[in-house]
Design a protein with these regions (language model features):
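One-carbon transfer enzymes
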Residues: 1-180
């Protein structure tokens, strides 16, 4: 068995704490590289270039309406799921965290090469660039809310329920590669 540690690439979120706490009970997690938040303006401009103005306008309207209401209406259910599944929200200790601006920074590659992990777990980061992916020497898995590829994006589970397609509401865990 490979005794090298696991590395987590993630965004600062409760789900990152849950993933870290669950994994670290049974496996050695060396570090959690936490990606900083991208400015909203930069994020929107990048999406417009990639997806077009009309699509992004719809996404922004969704975020400012339903996206703002979802957490308020779902908080009771979220707490119930956390309790029923004994999910551990304990914050990750400071010495485990390495903050970076982006998972696509050159510094991230240096950290990965130094740690030499057996596996990288991704949770909630922006899309990892092909340049970074081709230089990572181990398997990478990603957790994604929603059943991909049918429901992509941050609110995949929501859209499955809106479309009365509950069999596609869930979480996808998949290997990461350069093809999206």
């Amino acid at each position: 068995m490979d005794n090298r540690p696991i590395l987590i690439l993630a965004a600062a979120h409760d789900t990152t704490n849950i993933v870290y706490n669950a994994i670290s009970k049974n496996f050695a997690v060396e570090k959690v590289i936490l990606e900083g938040r991208e400015s909203k303006k930069k994020f929107i401009m990048r999406r417009i270039r990639r997806l077009g103005l009309l699509t992004v306008t719809g996404q922004v309207l969704f975020q400012f309406t339903i996206g703002k209401l979802l957490p308020k209406f779902s908080q009771k259910r979220i707490l119930q799921i956390i309790r029923e599944n004994n999910l551990d929200l304990t914050p990750i200790t400071g010495e485990k965290i390495m903050p970076v601006d982006s998972v696509n920074d050159e510094r991230v590659l240096s950290i990965i090469k130094e740690i030499d992990p057996s596996l990288i777990i991704v949770n909630g980061t922006r899309i990892i660039s092909k340049k970074i992916l081709k230089n990572i020497p181990c398997k990478i898995i990603n957790t994604h809310a929603g059943i991909t590829p049918k429901y992509r994006g941050v609110h995949g589970g929501y859209w499955a329920l809106v479309n009365r397609d509950p069999q596609h509401n869930g979480v996808t865990v998949h290997y990461v590669n350069a093809g999206i």
